[in-house]
């Protein structure tokens, strides 16, 4: 479609932290439908009971759950700066992989064992809920319930990983029964990774996120939701009647409540989150063998850490190709290329060649496969100062809610998080009445922690040694 009047993402007067208007092509979106650029009406509605900013996983999931209760009749409008699912979810690695033990010990150290376990249990429940809705509604999105392998090729890192595993087992968390940890000479044969010293496996999922969200979009439009793509919100202001004035380059509209679901771009409209949720770029690619050849079989999804501790995540595709990304340690020294950077129109220069011959040098049996990169892209994620998403009522802004800051880990969180946020929006319940992990709650304390703290003490760039004790 031809995008009319003033819908480029960055126009005069728009906030800095806005998506660029020309994102690079991405494998997942090659067969995009017209829904990606849908507008339900030529003009913006004058008023909606609820306006959702962002048509990615968070925004569409929230809208889905808001419409599930047939007894509640609320008008809903979704405003999206670009196309549907054009951000992080539409450009990710295809994983829906709960965190069983990776960051959980950090959360335990900061807030106690139960607080850490809540997150793992929530993410496992999220995976099951996604599986259930996909099966019930017969959604064509290549969903596969699989085993995911964690692999360590560095001896020191392998020992630390085993110690973490033993610690988690000692806590008697029931979900750890699903984890199998391997050490010894048989590890390379078990995981298929050259030089592997230790590996672990547990239940996870892989999927085509863009197709999943296109299904949700069709459902929402059928339910009467008003979707406006290429309509960046430039400001949200309360009026004297208790409503909100939503400004866009296409005009203004009013809303009863506002849900901020723009993830990395949240601070464009909520500047208090400017040091809490930082846009950070990542890199991802699709690798395939020559047409007509058969790729070596890989049944599991992976996170692999090489001998120099470079982490990569990947999922095997039904067509034999691989989607792989990561390599953060390669581009991390070049801060300007990825940190506080919203430009997903260009690759991360320092890492764009990292995945050449990746399968041949990493996985046994791929040496003569001829596998090459067929597509490579970048995306912008919202990383938070303390590694937890911000969910709930925006402090000191009644009627505004946030669901953002997923740290590149939104797939295992968003579906059920959006369900609980929808309850807060519709039923008026407090965060403490939801099923959300306590550490996910946005708060003035967390906002102040990042605003008043040092960048180098936060989790994104630094040591994570900030104070976590409330005064």
Model-derived features: where do they sit?
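Active-site lid/adjacent beta-loop-alpha segment flanking the redox-cofactor pocket in flavoenzymes
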Residues: 293-399
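Short hydrophobic core segments
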Residues: 50-53, 79, 233, 246, ...
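Glycine-rich FAD pyrophosphate-binding loop
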Residues: 67-91
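C-terminal lid/capping helical subdomain adjacent to the catalytic/cofactor pocket in oxidative enzymes
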Residues: 2-48, 65, 69, 240, ...
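Central helical "cap/lid" subdomain
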Residues: 248-299
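Rossmann-like flavin
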Residues: 107-219
